[in-house]
Amino acid sequence: MTVEEQFGRNLAYCRRRAKLSQEELAVRASIHRTAVGMIERAERLPRIDTLVKLTGALGASADELLDGLEWEPGDIRLGRFREAAS
């Protein structure tokens, strides 16, 4: 699973747990409604300011949205994200 897919999955889970539609989350986070869908569909990753807005709007922590993402150390060109072991 890619970083985008894992983050999108985490965002969708937190949004559903908060009982919000994508549009409601977008309004609360002051971001465009299509941005939420694009993030959930793994078409883009949020900037750090958007991450902060999303956590505030969801009442979630950044840890929840980043859950399952791990960095595998290495040369800056060779390091990569990997799926966390279950």
PLM ranges: what are they?
Residues L11, L25-A26, V36-I39, L65:
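Conserved hydrophobic/aromatic packing and binding residues within compact polymer-binding modules
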